């Protein structure tokens, strides 16, 4: 089971700005080259998380304002990520897997939206590959954790209108060939250190 960090792209407001240095968003990068910008909401009560499972695009919106747009990794066939309308009802930054296999494996920045389903840090593949949870690169997971709170609504559908308006700007990410860190690193408390720099920026 692979779980690590990543990069991202992003944009906001009336004019969408790509902040990853990739003008088209079509190039695929590995985990080491992934960096994300997320905008601080004006009204946190208006934040909503939207996930398109067919494209694996994740958008964080404040009304019509885009705060963050990144690639996620959703459930594989036979272990699909649930669709529908949910709310974040539990957050835990330093969460670890409690069952075997891989007991103790970090699931940092856990944001639970349904029983046993949540957003968390992990290796992001270009195809659905999880057991139903939604994995995000560390760069994205830390910022999602900062953007949402208990009660933040979540919408998960096979496709979303935002796929057409913002989807082309999502930087594609492929960590399927990235090596797993040593287990000693995964089990270290230092694993839960935030990525460098501010998690949210003003626009």
Residue ranges and their predicted role:
Residues 15-16, 126:
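Residue-level signal for mature regions of secreted extracellular proteins and peptides
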Residues 1-11:
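Bacterial N-terminal signal peptides that target proteins for export
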């Amino acid at each position: 089971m692979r779980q690590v960090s990543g990069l991202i792209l992003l944009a906001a407001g009336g004019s969408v700005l790509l902040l990853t240095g990739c003008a088209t968003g079509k190039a695929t990068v590995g985990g080491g080259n992934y960096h994300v910008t997320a905008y601080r909401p004006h009204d946190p009560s208006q934040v909503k998380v939207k996930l398109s499972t067919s494209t694996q695009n994740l958008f964080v919106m404040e009304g019509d304002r885009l705060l963050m747009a990144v690639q996620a990794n959703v459930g594989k066939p036979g272990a699909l990520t649930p669709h529908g309308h949910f709310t974040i009802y539990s957050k835990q930054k330093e969460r670890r897997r409690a069952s075997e296999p891989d007991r103790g494996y970090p699931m940092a920045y856990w944001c639970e939206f349904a029983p046993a389903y949540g957003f968390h840090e992990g290796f992001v593949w270009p195809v659905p590959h999880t057991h139903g949870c939604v994995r995000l690169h560390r760069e994205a997971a830390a910022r999602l954790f900062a953007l949402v709170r208990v009660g933040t609504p979540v919408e998960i559908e096979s496709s979303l209108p935002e796929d057409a308006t913002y989807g082309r700007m999502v930087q594609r990410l492929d960590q399927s060939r990235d090596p797993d860190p040593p287990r000693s690193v995964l089990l270290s408390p230092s694993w839960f250190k935030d990525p460098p720099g501010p998690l949210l920026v003003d626009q």
